[in-house]
Amino acid sequence: MQRVPAIVIPALAAILASPAAATAQHQQQIQIDEWQVPWEQSRPRDPFVGPDGKVWFVGQRSHYAAYLDPETGDFEKFDLDDGTGPHNLVVDGEGTVWYTGNRTRHIGRLDPETGKIEKFLMPDDRARDPHTMVFDQEGNIWFTVQGGNFIGKFIRGTAEVRLVEAPRVEGSRRGNGSRPYGIKMDSHDRPWIALFNTNKIATVNPETMELRSYELPEGSRPRRLVIDSHDMVWYVDYARGYLGRLDPATGDVREWANPSGEGARPYGMAIDSDDRIWFVETGVQPNRFVGFDPATERYFSNTAIASGGGAVRHMFFHEPTNTIWFGSDTNTIGRAKLPPRRRGIS
């Protein structure tokens, strides 16, 4: 373990240097604070706020898990085996950290009290790169395997791993797998998965482990997704620069063009307790943190990320503080303070 203090990058006003930025000055801007991670060029990513308020994240390039204490600004690091390539983590109610060993085909369990790590290997060698995780209502972990082309369920009580192979794709320049990517749970405890190498979103029946997919507009490439309080599936279309909404009951899809247009490259995504959608446009520099209100069907917030962002890949909404946490390719951990919650949400 290694504990070090942080350098804080203060929030800056949006940089008005592009058409998107010029439009943004007419929209609400929010406060974004960033902490410089002390381990250089480590690609800190996928933060998750634990029960004690510490913000856990992984260093994908430098093979560690770490936390930021936002009260003190201190960081503490837990080294993983060289070559692990951790991609994502989640923290359970007891404070135990679970991470994906993206380059070593395992899910890891880290005990922060002792530093002890326990590894759970994938039962199929093809499931080589566990990617993104999410808890279900029973505390089990659903996860994606991007290159290996699986969706998985890790049952914590027995350490059993169940895998469902995603559909194959013909004629793609990015290989013949669907590339399961972002994953979230709905209110019925069903996982929803963005199939990034397709124009489809999938779900898995938790009882039968059968997969069903829903088609999006031609050319769409969904990368991340969130589920609102009505079980509507919202996604960012990385290829075309759209925010989309899938109604699972009908299969209907609606789309809204991103503020920065076709080259927006929307990536990291979150939803707050008012069902407002937040995502980051990574195709523009500095990256832009964008808010969309489904009640008005309008973009209402657009803020530049002071460090530039590079790429913000994943985001976490912390309801008790009404904040969104993210990691950036500029080696920072960021916190966005959201506008006050609305009243009378239907």
Region locations from a protein language model:
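Bacterial N-terminal signal peptides
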Residues: 7-17
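A short helix->beta-strand "capping" segment at the edge of beta-propeller domains
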Residues: 25-41
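Beta-propeller fold detector
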Residues: 33-36, 76-80, 118-122, 162-168, ...
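Beta-rich, blade/repeat-based domains predominating
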Residues: 40-51, 82-94, 125-138, 169-188, ...
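Conserved beta-strand positions in repeat-built beta-propeller and related beta-rich domains
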Residues: 55-61, 97-105, 141-147, 191-197, ...
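A short loop-to-beta-strand structural motif that recurs across blades of beta-propeller domains
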Residues: 64-66, 105-109, 149-153, 200-202, ...
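Short loop/turn segments that connect beta-strands within beta-propeller blades
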Residues: 69-73, 111-115, 155-159, 205-209, ...
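Blade-level signature of beta-propeller repeat domains, shared across WD40, Kelch, NHL, RCC1
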Residues: 310-346
